[in-house]
């Protein structure tokens, strides 16, 4: 018996997959728990249209992310901070500070989780930072850390 999975089922398949199962397994386990539905013609058509819309949406998101990455790539964000005697910062510059600087100086709102810092910036200078905007798109920006003086 063929069924369409409505949710991910361990050792059976992922949501939207069409799988063959025994009638008893489908009737007694999958249907009562709303894990699957019978693979009827209407259900298969509905599934096909859902997959097409998801593919189109994914393609659109990838295109938007690549366009944003192209715009952001190579930008410079200048941050002015308080500095101690030895040229070390009071505190550190985190990915949130970089995201705020990118928004205030260039108008691009990037989630701080997408900014990749190996460790917080604690010294003056220019740093090359990677932004992972999307799994298929990333951009590099320069962060200039200068003294407030």
Swiss-Prot record:
The keyword DNA repair does not apply. This is Large ribosomal subunit protein bL9. The keyword ATP-binding does not apply. Coiled coil: none annotated. One of its GO terms (molecular function) is structural constituent of ribosome. It comes from the Bacteria. Pfam families: Ribosomal_L9_C, Ribosomal_L9_N. The gene is rplI. Binds to the 23S rRNA. HAMAP family: Ribosomal_bL9 (MF_00503).
């Amino acid at each position: 018996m063929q069924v369409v999975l409505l949710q991910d089922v361990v050792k059976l398949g992922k949501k939207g997959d069409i799988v063959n199962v025994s009638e008893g397994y489908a009737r007694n386990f999958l249907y009562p728990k709303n894990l699957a539905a019978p693979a009827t013609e209407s259900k298969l058509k509905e599934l096909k249209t859902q997959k097409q819309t998801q593919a189109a949406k994914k393609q659109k998101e990838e295109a938007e992310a690549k366009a944003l990455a192209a715009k952001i790539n190579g930008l410079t964000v200048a941050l002015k901070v308080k500095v101690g005697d030895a040229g070390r910062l009071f505190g550190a510059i985190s990915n949130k500070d970089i995201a705020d600087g990118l928004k205030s100086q260039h108008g691009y709102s990037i989630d701080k989780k997408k900014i990749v810092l190996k460790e917080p910036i604690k010294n003056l200078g220019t740093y090359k930072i990677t932004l992972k905007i999307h799994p298929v798109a990333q951009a590099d920006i320069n962060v200039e850390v200068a003294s407030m003086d």
